[in-house]
Every structure is written in structure tokens, then in C-alpha cells.
A protein has these predicted regions:
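Acidic, mature catalytic/reactive cores of soluble proteins
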Residues: 1-632
Length: 632
């Protein structure tokens, strides 16, 4: 027998030792078999640690569960020693993030045993008064086995599983895209629930003051994409649906396992804001070009790099006026996440996708800009449905919020209250839809501009929790109305819509059915039991079900036009256009071209609407200004 073995990542000495072993009289086959057995046992132990080994009457389901858990921990990692914490690794983590805070708290670390449990660290923090230190320790997660995604379209993301350092010592590390990490931590938190509080800390400390998250997250900090004009894969922007459902699932787990811990987190200023150098444009600019909505602040990016050199990974967090890390409570972090979505709410339509990135749930990946998500609206409703009673049950009657955030909350509450009678009752007119969209959008713009231009003032304002709850309850109620407005005539629900904005209002353009819309509505906790059953039956009898696979499709298997059937400009349209008629008469092919049979097409050089807009601008300067102005 023979085998092919790849013993990779070996240095020159190790290579020669391996060669000597092969040339020796040792039973190589037996050594390899023994190593495979040890590796298999180690892998089984890892899967077991995350509750992946089950024994049930359904062997196929048990095996399926084991493979799911394996793939899960390969992305998000696992707590290889459960709740055990190595003090040396904890101190290394804290020093890497903020050397000054670490040095100021050497007494705290000296008092800790060399090996401790999560609960020991939690108890030690109760006697601590340094909230910066508490933030660092609350964010510590001793994870291992996490790998990068390995998607070739993301050059940074080379496949790797690192479990040992160069000296062969166990390596605690994790890294990945935001979705890869938090989607898998949701499941992991069921196995080690107390660390769920630290996962929440990691999540909210990596979100920005304007309510979004960077692209990449690692043990060493956060990272974001930068403009690369020469790289067709590169782009900046925020994915639209990360902020809600992943955080909500972690909060739900925390409430289920340790509600007292979550309440204590609500009022402690032990959380920070990521300082991503993206600047979302004004509402008017977004409305003018919803595909180009974010600017990259190169000077701020350089300042952040310098801060990282000086203080550690904390340099990527929003500073306070004194240059330290600005900290707020968990209640504020949750509110920022929710308000950023509510501010992009369009009645009867969904949540506007206007940050240059699609949603992961978007099966088309092409709706960003004019696309509006019912999917995210459903998850927003579920979040609001949970957070209203959560805030109502808090023991305090007031909460301290950043002055800027408190004013933003007040403006959003005012908009919802003034339009409650219309958007809270059912479908509204295009005019009212635009009025609400503009009022919310400009409120968010004022808040963002204040943060962008001045940073956080660090001035806190006392806000009645009753006012916070009132705002969130109003948002919950209108979200429920809009979700129901998206019920299709066939009993399914819209997943995504498009909008057309004009001077008179906002029109909704509905799309075909998609699976994600049904999943989101079922997850929203809006439907009654009989409504959910009806939807499931309708789904089974819809074009989304495929009997061949006994499963469901993301969207129906539609008959699409062939290549030769595309880009055909109808004769009636050409004849109604003075501009096209004039261009064809003069032989100008900047906008349209014609074949020998008389069929008209848009110029083949166009790859998007921006190309068409540029051509129209050129034509306006070449003697066609009147016609361009009339038809543009």
C-alpha cells in the first residue's frame, strides 16, 4: 500500500528530520496511522467541546449535527478549555489593546491566579473601578481553531487554521468577516452561555457611532476596507443586515441564561464606539445618487493608524476629548443600532439599503441604492418586540446617554409620534411616505454630521426610560403595520422592494417572491400561529418549493430572456424620444445604435447608469442640451 502525505509549513531542520525518518527502518505506515488516529481523537474532542457529538435514534441527523458543529467552530472558533482562562493570555490581550490601561492596572492582574475561571474574573471586576479595564476584560474571549473564510474574491482572506504558535504552544485566536464570526458565535453561546456577555461586548464595541460595523473582526481588533481604484473586487461600505439579528440572538441567549448580568451591563459605561473612517453623505446626496453614499476620510485613517501605534488596538476606537477611549453604556449602544435602522425606515416598504453594500440575505446582491429590505424590517420588529419589555423591566427610571444620541432619539420619537395616525394605521400615500422618509433621514444626517465634525462631546444627558420605551414602542407598532402591508395576494410576503423617488412622493416597485422574505416574517414574531401555518402551507405550494430536491429555492426558477433578447429599445419609445430620433438621424452613436434591420439598442459600451449619465452630459454640451434636459 502507499499514501500521499503533506507535512506542510516545516522549516529546513524539520524537513531534514522528516527525510531522515523516512530513510530509517521505522515503520512509517504505522507512525502515520497513529498520527491520524491522534488527530481524529483531537478533532472529536473539539467537536465534543461545542456539544457536537450526539447519540439519537436518527443517525443521519446526529451525523448532520456533528458536521454542522465542526463547520461552525472552524469559522467562529471554540472555547477549547471551556470557562478556563490563562492569566498570561488575558494580560497579553489587554496589553495589546491598550498598553496604558494595562500598565495602570498591574496590581489587578498580579492578584489573579495563573489559571482562573470566567466567574473568577467576573468577581474580580466587581471590585474594580476602572471602566476601561472592565471593557477590555469583558471583551476577552479565549477562542481557538477559528479560521479565515478563504473566499478568493477577498484577497486578505487567505484560508488558514492556526492552532499553535511558532514554538508549538497552543494559540488562542479568531478572525473573519463580521458575519462569519457572529453568525457562528450565536450557536457557540448555547454551549458556553456565560461567555455570551463577552460576545455582546465584542459586538457592540466594534460598532460605530452612526450605527454600523466594520467588515472584519479579529482578536487583534477591527479592520475596514480602503479604496483600491485598481482592484475590481475592492469597495467600501456597510453591509445592511449585520447589526440587528446577530446582536439580538446574543441578547436573547443572555436573557435566557443570565438576565441579571445583562441588566447590570445596561447602565455601566464600559462600552466603546469603533472609529471607522467612513463618512455617510447627506440625505440630499443619498437621494441624488443612492449608489454613491459614503466617502473615505483618508486623513482620519492616518490619524487612527498613528493612535494604534501609540496605544494599541484601542486606537481604532472613538476617542474622548482627552485622547482616551470614549465609553458609554450598553443601553446607548443598543439604541444606536436600532435608531440607525429606524432612520432608514420607509413606510410600507422596509429599511432603505443605502450604504453601498447589499444585504447577505439579498439573493440578487444588486438592490443596494434603490433597494429596500422587508427582511431587515422583520428583524427590526423582532428586536423592538424584545427590547421594549427588556427596557421596561429595568430597575432604574432614567438612563445616561451621550448628548448627541439623546437628541437623535428625541427627533426620531417626534417624527414617529407626528405621523403615528397615518403610518400606524395602514398603507399610506406616496406623499406621506416621502415625508416620513425625509424627516427620519434628515434627523439621522444632523446626528451624523455632529459626530463626524465634532466627535463625541462626552457630555451625558439624563433621559427618562419612559421616553426611550415610547420611541421604541412606536417604531415596533409601525414596523408591524408595514410588514403586514407587504403581504402578497398569493399569501407570501415580499422580501425586497425597490423605490422610485420623485417630487410628489415615493413609489414602491415590488419584486418577485424570495425565500428570505418568508423566513424573516416567520422569525419576526409578528404572525399568530394560524397565520404562520397558512404561510408555511402557501410556501410549500409556491414556485419556491422544488420537489426534485424536497427543499426550497432562494427565488423561483424563472425563464430569463436570452442575451440576444436583451437591450432592445422598443420602436414606439424611440419614436417618442426627440433625443433618440435626432441622434439616429445624425449618425451619433454616443447613446444608441441601430442595426441594418432598424432595431435600436443602447450603446454596447455602457455598463451601468453612470455611463449613460456621462453620455447624456456630453451630448448636452454638443448641441443636444434642450432634448437632454427634457428627457433626462
Amino acid at each position: 500500500s502507499w499514501g500521499i502525505v503533506a507535512d506542510v509549513n516545516q522549516g529546513p531542520a524539520a524537513i531534514r528530520d522528516t527525510a531522515a525518518l523516512i530513510e530509517a527502518d521505522a515503520d512509517i505506515a504505522a507512525l502515520i496511522a497513529k498520527d491520524i488516529k491522534i488527530g481524529s481523537q483531537n478533532l472529536e474532542r473539539l467537536v465534543s467541546t461545542a456539544d457536537g457529538i450526539q447519540m439519537t435514534g436518527d443517525t443521519l441527523s446526529a451525523n448532520h449535527h456533528a458536521s454542522n458543529v465542526l463547520f461552525n467552530i472552524m469559522r467562529g472558533g471554540l472555547f477549547i478549555d471551556n470557562y478556563a482562562i490563562d492569566k498570561s493570555d488575558l494580560t497579553s490581550f489587554c496589553a495589546q489593546w491598550n498598553q496604558r490601561v494595562f500598565e495602570a492596572n498591574t496590581t489587578f492582574f498580579d492578584a489573579l491566579p495563573e489559571t482562573l475561571l470566567y466567574h473568577d474574573l467576573d468577581a474580580a471586576l466587581l471590585d474594580n473601578t476602572d471602566l476601561q479595564l472592565e471593557r477590555l476584560c469583558r471583551e476577552y474571549l479565549p477562542l481557538s481553531f477559528s479560521r479565515r473564510h478563504g473566499d478568493p474574491s477577498r484577497p486578505w482572506n487567505r484560508f488558514a487554521i492556526k492552532v499553535k504558535d511558532e514554538k508549538g504552544k497552543k494559540l488562542l485566536n479568531y478572525e473573519g468577516n463580521w458575519r462569519d464570526i457572529f453568525q457562528n458565535w450565536e450557536a457557540l453561546s448555547s454551549s458556553v452561555p456565560c461567555f455570551g456577555a463577552n460576545m455582546i461586548s465584542k459586538f457592540v464595541n466594534a460598532t460605530t457611532a452612526d450605527g454600523y460595523n466594520p467588515y472584519r473582526i479579529t482578536r487583534q481588533g477591527i479592520d475596514w476596507e480602503r479604496p483600491e481604484p485598481e482592484n475590481p473586487w475592492a469597495n467600501i461600505g456597510y453591509w445592511g443586515d449585520h447589526q440587528l439579528i446577530y446582536l439580538l440572538k446574543l441578547i436573547e441567549q443572555s436573557v435566557a441564561h443570565n438576565p441579571a448580568a445583562l441588566e447590570s451591563m445596561m447602565f455601566r459605561d464600559a462600552y466603546a464606539y469603533a472609529n471607522v473612517p467612513y463618512r455617510i453623505k447627506s440625505y440630499a446626496s443619498i437621494l441624488s445618487d443612492p449608489y454613491d453614499t459614503i466617502e473615505f476620510d483618508e486623513s482620519l485613517d492616518r490619524v487612527i493608524d498613528k493612535r494604534v501605534e501609540e496605544m494599541g488596538a484601542d486606537g481604532r476606537l472613538m476617542p474622548d476629548p482627552n485622547g482616551g477611549v470614549y465609553q458609554v453604556n450598553l443601553a446607548e449602544k443598543i439604541l444606536v443600532t436600532l435608531l440607525s435602522k429606524i432612520a432608514n425606515f420607509i413606510p410600507d416598504t422596509g429599511i432603505w439599503m443605502n450604504t453601498q453594500r447589499p444585504e447577505w440575505n439579498d439573493a440578487n446582491n444588486a438592490l443596494v441604492g434603490t433597494g429596500v429590505s422587508v427582511v431587515t424590517l422583520c428583524y427590526l420588529h423582532r428586536f423592538l418586540n424584545k427590547v421594549v419589555p427588556l427596557f421596561s423591566a429595568l430597575s432604574q427610571e432614567t438612563v445616561q446617554l451621550s448628548e448627541e444620541e439623546a437628541e437623535f432619539l428625541g427627533e426620531v420619537r417626534s417624527v414617529l409620534a407626528s405621523h403615528q395616525s397615518s403610518i400606524g394605521a395602514g398603507p399610506v400615500s406616496d406623499t406621506i411616505r416621502k415625508d416620513v422618509m425625509e424627516a427620519l433621514g434628515t434627523a439621522a444626517e444632523r446626528y451624523r454630521n455632529r459626530i463626524y465634525e465634532q466627535g463625541c462631546s462626552a457630555v451625558k444627558q439624563t433621559v427618562k426610560l419612559a421616553n426611550v420605551i415610547d420611541c421604541l414602542a412606536r417604531a415596533r407598532d409601525v414596523s408591524a403595520v408595514s410588514i403586514r402591508s407587504n403581504r402578497r395576494s398569493d399569501g407570501l410576503y415580499h422580501a425586497y422592494n425597490r423605490i422610485a423617488v420623485n417630487t410628489d412622493g415615493v413609489q414602491i416597485k415590488y419584486l418577485y417572491e424570495m425565500l428570505e422574505g418568508q423566513v424573516a416574517v416567520l422569525s419576526s414574531e409578528l404572525l399568530e400561529a394560524d397565520e404562520s401555518l397558512s404561510l408555511l402551507k402557501t410556501l410549500r405550494n409556491s414556485p419556491l418549493y422544488t420537489a426534485r430536491q424536497h427543499s426550497y429555492l432562494l427565488y423561483p426558477n424563472r425563464q430569463l430572456p436570452s442575451f440576444m433578447a436583451r437591450n432592445l429599445v422598443p420602436r414606439t419609445f424611440v419614436e417618442s424620444s426627440r433625443l433618440m430620433t435626432a441622434l439616429l438621424s445624425s449618425g451619433n452613436t454616443d447613446l444608441v445604435e441601430q442595426d441594418q434591420s432598424g432595431q435600436v439598442y443602447f450603446a454596447g459600451k455602457f455598463n451601468n447608469t453612470a455611463s449613460v449619465a456621462a453620455a447624456l452630459t456630453r451630448l448636452a454640451s454638443e448641441g443636444y442640451a434642450e432634448d437632454v434636459a427634457a428627457e433626462r
